Amino acid sequence: MQEIFLCSISNVRSGDCKEDCAYCTQSSHHQGAIKRYKFKDEKVVLQEARALRELGALGFCLVTSGRELDDEKCEYIAKLAKAINKEELGLHLIACCGRADLEQLEFLRDAGIHSYNHNLETSQNFFPKICSTHTWEERFITCENALRAGLGLCSGGIFGLNESWEDRIEMLRALASLSPHTTPINFFIKNPVLPIDAETLSADEALECVLLAKEFLPNARLMVAGGREVVFKDNDKKEAKLFEYGINAVVLGDYLTTKGKAPKKDIEKLLSYGLTMATSCH
């Protein structure tokens, strides 16, 4: 039976981002109807960590909105990491806090963070069409910094932004040069507050994207993330093919500003596909 890994997300700082990423409702350039808060209370984060670990999650990603890490965010994430690790839950902790330099990432590593997530999102060529406030190159350098700091690298992208297949190949080729431990695969879902006007990918095209990712990243843990519940809806037969085509990790529960599948029902469905849940992160 195929073993899959469950990962969960905690949006520990939400909204009011000054970047203009066209795919993100957390940008202050878009009037998204989302919750906005500076820092989530530590007790709430610990409750989330315990609950999700009990459901079987092995990865727990602490995500902050905004362009980059700063001293305040570093201290906050470090404090959360130490508190979660003190619980001895056996969680693999990931931080996702935007652009970061080597010193900042080493600080997080020493505080108990195991991996850093920073997605390339799309190809270097297509990126200026979806963001003007920072460059693709900045993203790539942050990924390199994570590796230099001795952190596991989690880096992937979004399919369905109106990019071409050539753009998809270019992104995957760049990711392959980084050899990430985990690659999140997201499918863009149109939102009326966002400037990207793109139709939701069909399940068949999404599966083709997964096959392509597996070809370029045969050794990475491919994790299906945002958009799965919309692209595959109730099409169990095609959703099951995700795992035949190379997916071996799943985001369990909600995303940053959108609802995911109900965790218990999602796990039941995954088990019905003949999958088993990993019990340790390796």
From Swiss-Prot:
Binds 1 [4Fe-4S] cluster. The cluster is coordinated with 3 cysteines and an exchangeable S-adenosyl-L-methionine. Pathway: Cofactor biosynthesis; biotin biosynthesis; biotin from 7,8-diaminononanoate: step 2/2. Its cofactor is [4Fe-4S] cluster; [2Fe-2S] cluster. Gene3D superfamilies: Aldolase class I. GO terms for biological process: biotin biosynthetic process. Pfam families: BATS, Radical_SAM. [4Fe-4S] cluster binds at residues 17, 21, 24. Residues 1-228 form the Radical SAM core domain. GO terms for molecular function: 2 iron, 2 sulfur cluster binding; 4 iron, 4 sulfur cluster binding; biotin synthase activity; iron ion binding. Its EC number is 2.8.1.6. Catalyzes the conversion of dethiobiotin (DTB) to biotin by the insertion of a sulfur atom into dethiobiotin via a radical-based mechanism. HAMAP family: BioB (MF_01694). Belongs to the radical SAM superfamily. Biotin synthase family. Homodimer. This is Biotin synthase. It comes from Helicobacter pylori (strain G27). The gene is bioB.
